[in-house]
Amino acid sequence: MVVEKRNPIPVKEAIQRIVNQQSSMPAITVALEKSLNHILAEDIVATYDIPRFDKSPYDGFAIRSVDSQGASGQNRIEFKVIDHIGAGSVSDKLVGDHEAVRIMTGAQIPNGADAVVMFEQTIELEDTFTIRKPFSKNENISLKGEETKTGDVVLKKGQVINPGAIAVLATYGYAEVKVIKQPSVAVIATGSELLDVNDVLEDGKIRNSNGPMICALAEKLGLEVGIYKTQKDDLDSGIQVVKEAMEKHDIVITTGGVSVGDFDYLPEIYKAVKAEVLFNKVAMRPGSVTTVAFADGKYLFGLSGNPSACFTGFELFVKPAVKHMCGALEVFPQIIKATLMEDFTKANPFTRFIRAKATLTSAGATVVPSGFNKSGAVVAIAHANCMVMLPGGSRGFKAGHTVDIILTESDAAEEELLL
């Protein structure tokens, strides 16, 4: 077998090559309760003002501000309560001279009133109360349209539908939502050394951990996943299963077979399915031999057989492809700064991605490498919630240095932030 020439390219260029391809999924309509994590296919425009009416943000009394002028500790002013309303109710009374309506949070301001006095700002009697300070016009009132006005774009095309977006959609009565269909993913683990999870271990064999991991990563994104039987190192059967996967799925992910060994057939498979190879080497560790190809609007990802390298390849390259296919506004991995809490002394000729544990505190983010960090390591992945990105050409980093991290999980907040 002829060894294919590989020229490494930077990580950013690799991602750019992926998202430069013309690949998009169609728009579909889904029920609101099924829309979480989908990408909006159109702008959502406010069809009415929010709030729809002047309302009280507090429990208290609605008054005319003019009647409160001159109030002080030495000159308490008295008001008579003429009505009592809760949220969802509207008073039919007109608030007059030194009159007030007892009002609950969210209720519409009654006619004639233009300020709200909170309960704790009053001394209440049976049908009256007194105040000791003046109130200005519109004080303690949420005004009609102060949050959004009719015609405002409240959610943008390409935005991910999160729980907050679902609240907005529900507010405007969207029982159904137009979204971009999420791509389906085929997962094919390759390697004659692989055993299924329930197989008895044999000498020279390992269980297939990459397949279940990639399936979980894809399902976490809300993608439909097709799991294929573990493939032996055989070119003909490899070509056949990839062709079958391409017929049924929008993305095909293989793990293993991307290196330069005697049984690494992925380049031949890509030739057989007439796929254009976008790149076959990236200037990074782990996962330098990650290979990505493109054919008929579909992506083919050849991820490393090493678990850590496989995980890194999915986070860096598969995720942006999925977002691109769905028309997301943001496709590149989001990077934040963190303080390294332990030395990492290994030299980095290429950009290195380290599995790590990040903690977000009120003082900023800190990060600690997550145990054993070789590309074949498995256990470190389970204890990591981010990847530290160390630039190439460095000779290691000391504790206290500021580094870039990519969060891969959402459990980085310290308990103190919740107290």
Predicted segments with their positions:
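Short, glycine/charged-enriched hinge/interface segments at domain edges or termini
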Residues: 2-5, 9-11, 17, 61-232, ...
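Short, hydrophobic/aliphatic alpha-helical segments
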Residues: 36-49, 90-102, 292-293, 297
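Generic structural signal for well-ordered, non-membrane alpha-helical segments
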Residues: 7, 11-15, 28, 32, ...
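Structural signal for hydrophobic packing residues in well-ordered secondary-structure cores
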Residues: 19-26, 43, 109, 155-158, ...
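Solvent-exposed alpha-helices and their adjacent loops that cap or buttress functional pockets
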Residues: 54-56, 71-74, 92-96, 109-111, ...
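Short, low-complexity N-terminal leaders and the immediately following helix N-cap/first helix
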Residues: 1-75, 328-355, 416-419
